[in-house]
């Protein structure tokens, strides 16, 4: 018997918890469900698990997750799933949750974009920042057909930039990270930022400036991209203009626009839940303004919230733990240390030898 069948009332359609969002927070929430012996399903709008890490930054390295001095985004997602998959959570990909309804018995019904309906005893929103789309430069209105060929908004495959003359636009962490990350792959790297100083991590900013001093990267501050040159479907150059009015033409094969993403709560915004800072307000138990409906990760707001992966994982653990009293009212909730549970699972595992 799998954990997905422990608390069913007879049908296999209902789960104890539906998790909306399959990023790191959502995956770890599913792991916590397994640790707490409740069934769950993950509903993810993208065609794969991992959220923005998988969709936008699979080759980006992350440095602020406890226990990992350095880990590629795709590697972190893979590790989280490896940790979780032994509990066999139901996973539904490529479906967006469009509405929810709390039923008279306190359970929840969610409807997805295809019209399918899923039932669960509680609901956890772990949808990150909601739907996201890259910020674009309004003055570049002739590059849509170059996107994915010569113009990019994220680095999904470093091979797209190997041996190419790359112009990177931005001054935050992503722009700085990939300026450093592409130095040994690209034929030439140029970083353009419209402000007079970088907004990204100080250590990476120093690496960029050191690379500039050694002639490995071109850096233009107080400068904007004004237009591009192209030959058919091929980018050939980028035109820059500084705030002082100086113009410059940079020959380029790739334009990498790393100026952030616009987030949109989408259907969540109309769910009649309390909002603050474009997120769902939660209490100390990660519960929203609706009893039985929880939120975790970037989509959850509480005073002092720090939007990093580590916090999302902690949110997920608290949300699942606190949902138990709603899912199984009247039952005494006992905490089991992971070391003890792991040992118990090993003892109960079938002997394949």
UniProtKB/Swiss-Prot annotation:
Keywords: FAD, Flavoprotein, NADP, Oxidoreductase. Binds 1 FAD per subunit. It is an enzyme of class 1 (oxidoreductase). One of its GO terms (molecular function) is flavin adenine dinucleotide binding. InterPro entries: FAD/NAD-bd_sf (IPR036188), FAD/NAD-binding_dom (IPR023753), Fd--NADP_Rdtase_type_2 (IPR022890), Ferredoxin-NADP_redctase_2 (IPR050097). It comes from the Bacteria. FAD binds at residues 25, 44, 52, 57, 97, 132, 298, 339. SUPFAM superfamilies: FAD/NAD(P)-binding domain. It catalyses: 2 reduced [2Fe-2S]-[ferredoxin] + NADP(+) + H(+) = 2 oxidized [2Fe-2S]-[ferredoxin] + NADPH. Its cofactor is FAD. Its EC number is 1.18.1.2. Pfam families: Pyr_redox_2 (PF07992). Coiled coil: none annotated. HAMAP family: FENR2. Belongs to the ferredoxin--NADP reductase type 2 family. Homodimer. This is Ferredoxin--NADP reductase.
């Amino acid at each position: 018997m799998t954990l997905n069948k422990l608390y069913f009332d007879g049908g296999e359609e209902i789960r104890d918890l539906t998790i909306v969002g399959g990023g790191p927070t959502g995956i770890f929430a599913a792991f916590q469900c397994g640790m707490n012996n409740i069934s769950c399903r993950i509903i993810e709008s993208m065609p794969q698990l991992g959220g923005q890490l998988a969709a936008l930054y699979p080759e980006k390295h992350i440095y602020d997750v406890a226990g990992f001095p350095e880990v590629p985004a795709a590697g972190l997602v893979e590790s989280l799933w490896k940790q979780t998959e032994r509990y066999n959570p139901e996973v539904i990909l490529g479906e967006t949750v469009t509405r929810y309804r709390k039923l008279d018995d306190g359970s929840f019904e969610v409807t997805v974009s295809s019209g399918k309906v899923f039932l669960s005893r509680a609901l956890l929103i772990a949808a990150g920042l909601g739907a996201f789309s890259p910020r674009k430069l309004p003055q570049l209105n002739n590059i849509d057909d170059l996107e994915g060929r010569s113009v990019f908004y994220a680095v999904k495959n470093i091979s797209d930039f190997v041996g190419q003359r790359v112009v990177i636009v931005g001054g935050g962490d992503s722009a700085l990270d990939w300026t450093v990350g592409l130095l040994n792959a690209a034929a030439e790297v140029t970083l353009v930022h419209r402000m007079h100083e970088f907004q990204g991590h100080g250590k990476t900013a120093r690496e960029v400036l050191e690379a500039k001093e050694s002639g490995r990267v071109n850096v233009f501050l107080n400068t904007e991209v004004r237009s591009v040159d192209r030959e058919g479907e091929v980018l050939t150059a980028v035109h820059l203009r500084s705030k002082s009015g100086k113009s410059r033409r940079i020959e380029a094969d790739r334009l990498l626009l790393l100026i952030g993403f616009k987030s949109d709560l989408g259907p969540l915004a109309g769910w009649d839940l309390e909002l603050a800072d474009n997120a769902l307000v939660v209490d100390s138990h990660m519960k929203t303004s609706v009893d039985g409906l929880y939120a975790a990760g970037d989509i959850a707001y509480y005073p002092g919230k720090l939007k990093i992966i580590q916090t999302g994982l902690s949110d997920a653990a608290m949300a699942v733990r606190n949902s138990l009293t709603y899912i199984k009212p009247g039952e005494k909730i006992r905490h089991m240390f992971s070391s003890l549970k792991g040992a118990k699972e090993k003892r109960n595992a079938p002997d394949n030898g």
